[in-house]
UniProtKB/Swiss-Prot annotation:
This is Conserved virulence factor B. It comes from Staphylococcus haemolyticus (strain JCSC1435). It comes from the Bacteria. Belongs to the CvfB family. InterPro entries: CvfB_fam, CvfB_S1_2nd, CvfB_S1_3rd, CvfB_S1_st, CvfB_WH, NA-bd_OB-fold, WH-like_DNA-bd_sf.
Amino acid sequence: MALDKDIVGSIEFLEVIGLEGSTYLLKGPNGEQVKLNQSEINDEDELETGEEYSFFIYPNRSGELFATQNMPDITKDKYDFAKVLKTDRDGARVDVGLPREVLIPWEDLPKVKSLWPQTGDYVLVTLRIDRENQMFARLASETIVEKMFTPVYDDEKQNELIKARPYRLLRIGSFLLSKEGYKIFVHESERKEEPRLGEEVEVRIIGHNDRGELNGSFLPLAHERLDDDGQVIFDLLVEYEGELPFWDKSSPEAIKEVFNMSKGSFKRAIGHLYKHKIINIETGKISLTKKGWSRVEDK
């Protein structure tokens, strides 16, 4: 005979056998009792005793079986992105569309805690039920993503910026999945820092392989990358809220004191920044443009 947990995390037809106060009593396929709160009925009409209806089955925190007609986005057999509600020492708690949150245990998350998802991130998960009849969220494996991603076999996405979320983090690189279903790999040489699991990032497509998987980069195009002097100026602009009282006619002494570079190096650097529309140069000052600020947001 099947165990109770076989129906947990799945959609089943259950018979209504009674009503106690505001709670319906349902009969499971193995004779188990399942409770249904009236708030979890999606029709205004009352359910009829003796009739069968379709429900999603889940356990409360005590392991009691409950049902809902508000079908979740994720079941035992279905993967989707779930919103992270919060993280604590036990792991990350996600919203899968049920009256209660579901936990991704800490041991399933990255070993480096700074790479854990944060509140508002979305992680690719399914449901799993343990031997104690408790329900958890399970991160998608590479095998699962292989079955569900949308392949791209030409260069139509070349240099396109795509928003995606990491579902797997390795030292060699980051594996991401976009809303459109594109699978993207970013080698560690194509990033300055490792993104969090589930964090929304913008990745530039730089190629594809014969399996339809895309290769991406978090780095700007080569001609947009800043040299050392340009980076010094850019970082100071960010630190001082986007504006500095220097321009190409500032004194060499003042430039040396603040930027630790010659006036010639300073002029070349701000010329490069201006050419690529990262800064504006006005009388007596330089300031970040909207494009310049976007580089800060992309970090």
